[in-house]
Design a protein with these regions (language model features):
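N-terminal secretory signal peptides and thylakoid transit peptides that target proteins
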Residues: 1-17
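N-terminal substrate-binding region of glycoside hydrolase catalytic domains
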Residues: 35-90, 95, 101-102, 108-123
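Acidic-and-aromatic substrate-binding clefts and catalytic sites of carbohydrate-active enzymes
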Residues: 44-53, 74-87, 157-159, 202-211, ...
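Short, acidic/polar
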Residues: 48-60, 132-136, 208-218
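Substrate-binding cleft and catalytic face of glycoside hydrolase catalytic domains
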Residues: 67-71, 90-172, 176-194, 200-202, ...
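Aromatic-rich peripheral "rim/lid" segments of glycoside hydrolase catalytic domains that contact
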Residues: 151, 155-161, 165-172, 185, ...
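Noncatalytic carbohydrate-binding groove/subsite architecture in carbohydrate-active enzymes
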Residues: 172-258, 262-270
Length: 352
């Protein structure tokens, strides 16, 4: 007789919960994801979304961890005159605290954000370095004791996959040196938070993944207190093939550090055939299952969290921020907050 594992029991429960509906590849359940997942599960939020009680209730129903999508980035916190703005980050942190949700923070240092307060110090040596340290100490220190982790360095590898990005940080502090400093400053500010280096297209682009891994090796040898590896996992049906996620997880886990699937979504592609939406959603579910199974195959101490990049399809950057795919549907919950096949794949696999 086959042993009834937790995962098989959950799968059976999911199937039973769908009785009475039309049987299809799109049969899903509305069971709270966090109630059955054996790893922290999260999504990103924006302050404005949390003002909607229905949104806030749905988020708290399904997720045990949150990441502020925008308001903890430097472009929000650091004003032009050098003052800090913490109103919205504090409100998001308070929502997490009130609802027993883990707070994960992003992002400390990002090539894309050269704010006027730092541009004024460009090329000035010690004043620039002091401002860099003071910013990290102030921001990471503010959420000390609540934040479980930080994306300390974000998206350091260029899109060509072979080079590191150049920025105001590399120009003033050094290509590797600015990252080493950022990790040390963050560790000083919050010794108990897990400190991550985070990047995207690590599944789709093996060359970029290799460059990323060499960078991590150098930083570790230089003494950077890197505590974890973040893979954003912005996947795409046009480019992500079966096996890619599994290979990436195997490589990234080789450091022995905790892994955070930090920003999962799966785009339908540039020109999806919506007449075949059921098939497209099943392909999303298959990729989700592969990624989740690869993650769950890691030792427990390496499974930091599994995060999706948005609560509902209507909240996704794939539609709004990019503006190029207004009908994209890359998340486990649809526009109305109803589960899709991606959700069922997560529920079955993350149950352990």
């Amino acid at each position: 007789m086959r042993r009834l594992t937790r995962r098989s029991a959950i799968a059976s429960a999911l199937a039973l919960s769908a009785c009475g509906r039309e049987a299809s590849s799109q049969t899903v359940t509305d069971t709270p994801l966090k109630s059955i997942a054996t790893t922290p599960v999260g999504a990103c939020v924006q302050h404005a979304f949390l003002q909607d009680p229905a949104y806030a209730e749905l988020f708290a129903r399904h997720y045990s961890q949150l990441t502020p999508e925008w308001e903890m980035k430097m472009e929000y916190i650091l004003q032009d005159d050098g003052r800090f703005r913490f109103d919205r980050p504090d409100a998001i942190a308070d929502f997490a605290r009130r609802n027993g949700i883990r707070l994960y923070c992003t992002t400390m240092i990002w090539y894309d954000q050269a704010m006027p307060a730092f541009l004024k110090l460009d090329g000035q040596g010690k004043p620039f370095a002091d401002a860099y340290r003071n910013y990290i100490l102030a921001v990471a220190g503010r959420y000390r004791g609540q934040a479980v982790g930080w994306d300390v360095v974000n998206e350091t590898v260029a899109d060509n996959g072979t080079e590191l990005r150049q920025s105001i940080w590399t120009r003033n502090l050094g290509v590797d040196e600015h990252m080493v400093l950022a990790f040390h400053h963050a560790k000083e500010a919050d010794p108990n938070a897990t400190l991550f280096i985070n990047d995207y297209h690590l599944e789709n682009n093996p060359t970029k993944r290799a460059t990323f891994m060499r960078t991590v090796e150098r930083l570790l040898k230089a003494g950077a207190p890197i505590g974890g590896i973040g893979t954003q996992s912005h996947l795409d049906l046009d480019f992500t093939r079966p096996g890619m996620a599994r290979a990436a997880m195997r490589d990234l886990a080789s450091f022995g550090l905790p892994i955070h699937v930090s920003e999962l979504d799966i785009s339908l592609g540039e020109k999806p055939d919506f007449a075949r939406l059921a098939d497209l959603r099943q392909r999303q579910a298959d990729l989700t299952r592969e990624l989740a199974e690869s993650y769950m195959s890691l030792p427990q101490q390496q499974r930091f969290a599994f995060t999706v990049w948005g609560l509902r399809d209507q909240d996704s950057w794939l539609r709004g921020q990019s503006g190029q795919r207004p009908r994209d549907q890359g998340l486990p919950l649809d526009d109305a907050g109803q589960p899709k096949p991606m959700f069922q794949a997560l529920a079955e696999v993350l149950s352990g």
